[in-house]
Structure formats: structure tokens, C-alpha cells
Amino acid sequence: MKIVIIGASFAGISAAIASRKKYPQAEISLIDKQATVGYLSGGLSAYFNHTINELHEARYITEEELRRQKIQLLLNREVVAMDVENQLIAWSRKEEQQWYSYDKLILATGASQFSTQIRGSQTEKLLKYKFLSGALAAVPLLEKSQTVAVIGAGPIGMEAIDFLVKMKKTVHVFESLENL
């Protein structure tokens, strides 16, 4: 059996591990547009609070751990088409595109950040650190900034507010709900 999972965040990885337990002989593939898996979105907080030395340590699982479980990782790939009738998906990476067959398909594409829907949010000054690549880009900008606006006061936003205040930054909080 060939199991393909689109999305390699919490749900996708959980589905891959559960599938491996239930179907030990299956060929299992995780497809994701990110370059890495297992990054904890609270990694910046852990880094700036000196709980970890490098952002790469903010992981709940590594690529190697998944490979040891015989789970194939197809990273830096974006699914661009599906042919459900013939059980095929197409993924692309740079100039390359390939069709990939499956017996079972699991969609685990996860949540998206609301900030991407804000007009002007594509500026380099708006930091999004749900993924490791964004967190790595955020570190030098946060270190040199004196004033920071945090959009969203959910758990990750509150962690950001905490470490930014400890860094002696002026912090402005924008939250759509009435209470924090």
C-alpha cells in the first residue's frame, strides 16, 4: 500500500507515524513545501529565553527520526494538482514537476497564519515565524529593533511579548478579541 500525506506539520507527522504502526509494510510519503519538519513555533521564545542555544533545537521530531521509521520525506515541494479518480497528485519543486500515485491520501495541510491576509503583509518587516526559515530570518531583525508590534495575542503571541519585554523592547500589541 502506498500512503501519501500532504502536509508535514503536527497532523501530517502524527498521521505518518500512526500509519506506520498500523501498516508496517506500507510505503509512506510526507510531502511539504517547507525545507524542514518538526519545528516548534514557540522556538523563538525558547531561543531568546536561553532555553535552547540554536533555533534548530526547537523540534519535536527530526527528519532522521522519520527516515528511521521508513517514512519518505518529499520536502520543498508544493502539491499543484490532484487527479482523485486516478489516485494521482502532482507536486512541483523549482522547475521540476512530477506526478505521484497513491492508494490512500491524507490531507494534513494545517492552519494558516491570519497575518498573511493583511494588506501589506508581504513586507520583509512583518516577521512570520511559524516555520524554521521565518524564525531564522527574524532573529537578527528582532535583535536590532527597538520597537516591535505583535499582531495576535494567542499563546505564541504572548510568548513573543514576554521575551520582547525581557529584551527591553517597546512592544505594541494588536489583538482582534476584546480580552487577552
Where are these regions (language model features)?
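Mid-domain beta-loop-alpha active-site segment that forms a flexible
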Residues: P155-I161
